[in-house]
Design a protein with these regions (language model features):
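Catalytic machinery of carbohydrate-active enzymes
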Residues: 1-350
Length: 350
């Protein structure tokens, strides 16, 4: 009899891929006899390679080797050689839909995600808005496996189980807040809490203004002068901002500039007292290691279903405005033109 082997497809983005982890973990533990292979972009490997003995990872470079229809056909030939018995499309975009179509034509057991687009459109409508909570992405992913014949009870605590990541594996410079001043590795000191801040996101509608975030940092340091604040994220434009904060405040370290990728970030995040983030991938990374997250929401809204795993709605900082939410992903221009949903959140609220 053929070994049960599920292919799980989710290519991007980082936060959405991270949200598959609690579901894939729960599936793997509840069906230990079933092999599970996650197909994603190379960045996602750290999420899955040590998740469970029956979970494997397969990377696909969709901008290189598997670009275009020719590339997808080559990828499909590689996939069918793996002898999958079920296909779970957790993405349902053009590329995954093409692969899904090929599997369907070859009579595979295939299911894909229901994104509840109608409900989300009503959530962000400019008129007749209906502020109705949509199913979470976690539930949407679990529903796909149920369609395939694998109902899942979501049961996940942390990528490190009941423990935390090993700090000794991290570069020592991340624990050097200023020249000659090493941070104590005692993350349980109530007087010197470890606090993470991920101040940026992919779109302007999800970013708390820099001057206000700097005031938040100042107030945290005022309340906890011995605290250690680790900054996460930042692309080419954002890194200089975080470097400037680290230069200005001795308690602040630009952690992402010193760590080596997602694996290191997850280890450090597991030791934080709290993470402050936008509606961004870092909210989901911290959630995967059982760290409480205070999240700031502007153009987007937790009701769209993208709240971090097991995060409390009470820790979502947001304003009640008739125009909110105006976007599911935060990528639409502000209809008011002033991003008041972010600018009017005071540092004291945070």
């Amino acid at each position: 009899m053929k070994t049960e082997h599920i292919l799980v497809i989710r290519f991007s983005a980082m936060g959405d891929v991270a949200m598959t982890v609690p579901v894939v973990y729960s599936l793997a533990k509840q069906y230990p006899h079933v092999r599970i292979t996650v197909l994603s972009r190379p960045f996602a490997r750290p999420f899955f390679e040590n998740l469970s003995p029956n979970v494997g990872f397969m990377e696909a470079d969709l901008k290189g080797e598997y670009k275009g229809v020719k590339g997808l056909n080559a990828l499909y030939r590689r996939l069918i050689a793996k002898q999958f018995t079920a296909i779970a499309d957790l993405h349902s975009v053009l590329r995954s839909s093409y692969l899904r179509m090929r599997f369907n034509l070859d009579n595979f057991n295939v299911a894909h995600i229901d994104k509840h687009r109608k409900g989300k459109r009503m959530l962000v409508a400019s008129t007749n808005k209906k502020l109705v909570k949509q199913p979470s992405s976690f539930q949407n992913y679990a529903d796909v496996f149920e369609q395939l014949g694998y109902p899942v009870k979501l049961d996940f605590q942390s990528m490190f189980g009941e423990g935390k990541g090993d700090l000794s594996t991290l570069p020592q410079e991340v624990f050097q807040a200023e020249e000659g001043n090493l941070i104590s590795l005692d993350d349980n000191n109530l007087e010197a809490p470890w606090i993470g801040i991920a101040p940026f996101a992919a779109h302007a509608g999800k970013i708390y203004p820099q001057p206000l975030m700097e005031k938040v940092i100042q107030q945290l340091i005022s309340h906890y002068p011995h605290s250690h604040i680790f900054l996460f994220g930042g692309g080419q434009d954002e890194t200089p901002v975080m470097d400037a904060w680290a230069e200005k405040f001795p308690q602040v370290v630009n952690a992402s500039a010193k760590l080596h990728g997602i694996s290191d970030e997850l280890i450090l995040m597991s030791h934080l007292r709290v993470m402050l983030s936008m509606d961004s991938g870092n909210m989901h990374l911290a959630s995967l290691v059982n760290t409480p997250v205070v999240s700031i929401w502007g153009a987007t809204h937790p009701y769209a279903g993208f709240m971090g795993w097991h995060q409390s709605p009470e820790n979502a900082v947001q304003l009640d405005m008739p125009c909110r939410p105006c976007s599911i992903y935060g990528n639409k221009p502000c209809m008011r033109g002033d991003f008041a949903c972010m600018k009017n959140i005071s540092p004291e609220m945070v």
